[in-house]
Structures are given as structure tokens and as C-alpha cells.
Amino acid sequence: MSFYPILRGPAKQESPPPPPAPKKRRKTARACLHCQKAHLTCDEGRPCARCIKKNMGDQCVDGKRKQAKYLVGLPPTPPGQATQQKQQQQQQQQQAVQHGMGPPDTDFGSSAANLEYSILSNILGRGDTSSPPDFFPAQSPHMPSPMSIPGLHMEEEGSQTAGTPQGSPTDIYTSITKPYAYTTGFHALIAYLKSRFEKKELLDVVKSMAFYRPSFIATTQTLQYEDLVFMEKCFQRTLLEFEKYISLSGTPTVLWRRTGQIAAVGKEFCVLTMRSQADLLSQFIIECMDNKSVVQYFDVFSELAFEDSRGTITTTFGLTKPSGEVVNTACSLTIKRDVFDIPMMIVGNFLPIL
């Protein structure tokens, strides 16, 4: 029996361990001026390691931050004007405290926006009171009731009347010079709700408002005055096209702003609700609904405004006639947005349920 030798290759040599990875430089919050120009990573030391290596330690200073694009070109606020704005904001807050409201917790950079937000916050925070606080007293010169506001649905000076767009786009672009006063409309809406609903229903409505109203305030804070004027031009231009659609459609149709103010209405809707077109153009859309439908409308709108990307829903609402009779209808709501993706118009199509 023969044995064959087992041939073995040369012993394997263990490979040397890989060199340790170089430590990455830790990014600092602000690079020095030289590293910023060279687009290199800087460290937190001053002078930094790169400037020391290049013998420029005495010139190592923090670089300048770039200004936000929406702030470029804005003139600096004079010190006197800033002080005056601060005093006006403090006066607004003092008046709010006298009317039963505490100072707003959130600063939106605007006293009017802070006051609006405090209205919602205080109504929600007083659910255990016997009645909601009176934010809009009858003698208040700043917040009149809806019925006492002359031309509530009129634009500010330089704009045009809601619901009566000009005959051509050129007229719209030349006649509108000021933005629409949405804050006034919102205050009037709150005053109307307070005069109509009891505490429980009012709290349900305001809870729905609290979901979308702060978003409206926050999204408009970054817009300039020219942007707000452009938004109104977009609204009136869209309204002009829908006027043609309403005149050709046989479906009861009504258009209103995000504050609920009716801007255009078809004759079929006037017949359905037994109201004249002139009366409807001076009302909120919720004035044509029964109490249950009003609460439901604000709940639906809070979902469509920013959460639902489709911006349309089909539901049922009860419309009221001046006699008090309720007409049950199937309704299709569609939200139209402007170029800033902010809801600007709601289109409602109503069909009676027989």
C-alpha cells in the first residue's frame, strides 16, 4: 500500500489591518470667512486649523450668513417705526385683556394675526364657562357686528365689488390696487356665529376653525403686499370665468371666499333658497344652512383646506328658506387654490333631495 505525500501550499500570510479611517471634520454652525469662500469644512476653533496652517490666524473671523430670498430687497425697519409697532401691539393686547382675552401665546409677527389667534384660543379655553366671552361688544369701534358693517363684501378702496367682476381681464388687472380685507371678514364671521349659536355648538365650530385658521395666518405672513394684491387679482380673474360657467349651468351653484362670504351665485340657487341675488351677495354661505349643517360645514372645510390634497368632497347639507323651511340637498364642494397653494374660493353645487 503506497502513500502519497500531501502537498501543501505556502502558509497564508495574514494581511495587515486596514489603516484607520481619517476622522471627519465636524461641521460647525458657522464657517470662517476664508473657509466659506473656499467652500471647505471649517472647525469650531478660532483661528481654525486651516487658517493656522496657512499662517492667516489673525484674519480668521466668522463668515457672513446669506440673507433669506424673501427678505432680499426689503428696506430695514426704522427704529422709530419698530418702536411704534411694538407699542401698537401692546395696546392691542391690553384691549384684548380688558375684553376678557389673555395675551396670545404665539407670535406671528403681526398684532392683528396675534389678536385673531387669541380669539380662537380663548373660546377653546373657556369651555367651562356659562357663556362664551364677548370678544366683539356692540360698542367696539374696531369689531362691529356683520349687520352694521356697510359694504362688508366690498373690497378695500381701489378694489372691486365681490360677485360683480369686470367685463374683461384687463379691467381686473388695472382696477384692483389693494388686497381684500380677509381679517375684517373673519371678525364679522365670528360675530355672526356668536349671535346665532349656543355655547356647545359655537365651541364645535371654533374647534374646527382652530385646525385651519392658524395655517392661513402663517402662510400669509411671508407674503408681501404685492403678493396679497396679486392674490385678489387671481380671485377676481377666476370669478370671471366661473360667472360664465354659472350662467350656462342649470345646477344651483354658489361661490364663496374662504371666510364664507358669498362672491357669486346662480339664479337656480336663488330659486332653491327663495332669496334674491342681492341678498345672498351680502351674506355668509352659512346663513343659508341649518345649525347642524353649519357645524358639519366647518368640520368638512377644516379637512379640505390643507389636509385633503384632492380639495373636493360630496356630502349633504340642509339649506334654509326665509320661512324657516329646510331643503335637504346633496352638495359637491370644490376648493380652488391660488398660485401660493392657499384656498381662495369654494365652489358649491347643490341638488335638492326629493
Curated annotation (Swiss-Prot):
Q: Which residues does the annotated region (Disordered) include?
A: 1-29, 71-111, 128-169
Q: Which Pfam families match?
A: PAS_13, Zn_clus
Give residue spans, biased composition: Low complexity: 81-98
Write out the biased-composition intervals (Polar residues). Answer: 159-169
Q: Name one GO cellular component term.
A: nucleus
Recorded GO molecular functions are: DNA-binding transcription factor activity; DNA-binding transcription factor activity, RNA polymerase II-specific; RNA polymerase II transcription regulatory region sequence-specific DNA binding; zinc ion binding
Mind telling me which InterPro entries this protein's record contains? ERT1_acuK_gluconeogen_tf, PAS_13, Zn2-C6_fun-type_DNA-bd_sf, Zn2Cys6_DnaBD
Principal location? nucleus
Which Cys pairs does UniProt list as disulfide-bonded?
A: none
Q: Which UniProt keywords apply?
A: Activator, DNA-binding, Gluconeogenesis, Metal-binding, Nucleus, Transcription, Transcription regulation, Zinc
Where's the DNA-binding part?
32-60
Q: Indicate where this protein resides in the cell.
A: Nucleus
Q: Which SUPFAM superfamilies match?
A: Zn2/Cys6 DNA-binding domain (SSF57701)
An example GO biological process term is: cellular response to starvation
The free-text function statement in the UniProt record for this protein reads: Transcription factor which regulates nonfermentable carbon utilization. Activator of gluconeogenetic genes.
Q: Return the similarity comment.
A: Belongs to the ERT1/acuK family.
* Name the record gives this protein: Transcription activator of gluconeogenesis ERT1-1
